[in-house]
Amino acid sequence: MNDLRFAFRQFVRQPVFTIVAILALALGIGVNTAIFSVTNAVLLRALPYKNPDRIVAIDKVQTAEGIGGLIAGAYFDFREQSTAFQSFAAYGEDEYILTGAGEPERMLCAEVSPSLFSLLGIEPSLGRAFRPEEEKPGRDQVVVVSESFWQQRAGADPNFIGKTITLNDRAYTVVGIMPAQFQFPKKFEIWKPLALDPVKERHGQQFTLIQLIGRLKPGVTTAQAETELNTVWQRSKIEGPDERGTTRIQVRPLHEELVKDVRLAILVLLGAVGFVLLIACANVANLMLARAAARRREFAIRAAVGAGRGRLVRQLLTESVLLSLLGGALGLLFAVWGVDVIVSSIPAEVAGTIYGLGHIAIDRGVLLFTAGASVATGILFGLAPAISSSKLDLKTSLQSTATTSSARSGLRGTFVVLQIALTLVLLVGAGLMTRSFVRLLQVKLGFEPQHVLTVRVELPRSRYSKGPQRTQFFQQLLERLQDTPGVEAAGAISQLPLSGYSMIGRFPIEGESPTTPEEKHVPIPIGVVTPGYFAAMKIPLLQGRVFNAADRDGRPDVGLVNEAFARKYWPNENPIGKKIGAGCEKTLCRSVVGVVGDVRHEGLAQEPQPEVYTPHLQFPLNSMSLILRTDGDSMRFVSAVRLAVRELDKDQPIALVQTLEEHVSASILQPRLITTLLGIFAGLALLLAAVGVYAMMSYTIARRTGEIGIR
């Protein structure tokens, strides 16, 4: 206690030293606490399910070119033949339109096996979960809703159980309310049974792509489970597009699967802030050395009256740990602010797709980390100065003109060099990341995103079950929008660029002679577009023509290919008139009528792949993204789009309203965030290093004032 009181008095006597040291430590500990809170929520915190270490994700991995994803037939085989698992659960998601409660609203619903909730060990807080028989087609008109849905839509009415809601014009009975914190596989408002027909799924009459999880039996390892599932997979009799020779089943912990896309980014940031803390430690250690040198007479007097070396070391360590704890307390405030900044910089729709990101908080674990980091930091930066300063030559130290030992000067120089070296590492890393990000921004998109509005329209299959109904709706909608003053061009596509592909098909290509069975049907992305799409996106036409109103059902099937497709499959040949089998019941039924420029569909970092476009009039999908090129601010046309849709169908909502520039920006959210944070951390490191060098130079000059005066 005496040491603490003495340390406080010392800090009060030297306010400049105290403030500089506490601020340096607060910055170092604060950024570490902020990033650790993210790490804790996403990577370290156990999944909030029963025995989460036994829950695994099951996926199909391509060992050669092919179509990824498990089909439902495999789920039924695994469920019936596996002995390593207690249970399995399949899940997916789909868009539904909620009506009957005000304005129609698009809802993203999870479709899950009835076994999902029991597998996770989660029960509804009100009502019941799904029953096994409710996964059968025709028996699946029940839903479980989130607590937020229950509160917002039903005012938390306990009698809401048993009532119905309308999704895609079908009535679904609400049977349960999930707990407030429940989230699987991401944030959903509604869960409904995944209705599958085992016979059709196994015999090729339909192929439903699913995601699959399982709960291992006690004592079974993931390696054993993976071996068993691969055995079942290879002997499976499922009819379909999967080639057993080019695929294998992968089993890994569910937590690992949920965070795979962000793990590396978080670890990189954690390493960067670790460097910042080391620089802060070196900085304060230098200040402590300089301060200790100025107190050498005090230490000599204390030693002369009986204080041992251990007593001096203890006093100096007490001061350094106390200083670090004060810095940690201030750093905690910085961390709270930093976490808010990080979370607010991530769009809500993105945060809802990353496990744990919505639950970042300064909880007990983070507080313990901050306290531990503060104590460890205090010992780290205080130990070397304490040991160095306790080595006393009483005769020399008691002389008023005593000079600083060369050993201590060398130690201070070492700390300065360490700060500069670590700062350079961070600056180089941030510079390389910035250069990569700038190159990403300079990548040729293949289209012009300026002044373009995008809107998603998903027609419910219950009202638009036939192709002509869908084509008529989108054709009339685009005609109305095209006639809107200020709209220069209007079109639609099944999936926007930079967001993957809506379809990947296997079909023959004229001129291709497969040498192995696996190459018999080449997997190619297929985009479904309307005639005005390429003009609205300003994608160049390189050869032939684009689609027009004559390319409809009942007329010859036509298609467009991109430049990468033509270059790969028909080099040095004219692609116009070539045949492909995309979307055809008959082999090679579709004629290529044009070649368009390459567009990046899988992301700015991915090179354009060969792809095929088919006309919506011949391939009538129910879900399309509208593209409106305008003469100015495109967001001012949102009301016009909403009105045009309502005039055609009063119960049809619009969704995902954004400019194309916003869509492009969102596609590089992660590299932008990492680059920004690394730049901030490198800037902090540079600031700390500059303060350290300044302090070192100031102290050196102050100690040599007499010498400088004589000279």
Language-model segment annotations:
Residues 123, 295, 308, 393, ...:
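Short coil/turn motifs that cap or connect alpha-helices
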Residues 14-42, 279-281, 324-329, 412-436, ...:
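Short, strongly hydrophobic transmembrane alpha-helices
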Residues 280-324, 691-711:
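Interfacial "coupling" helices/loops that link adjacent transmembrane helices in transporter permeases
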Residues 47-95, 208-213, 445-506:
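Membrane-proximal extracellular/periplasmic loop immediately following the first transmembrane helix
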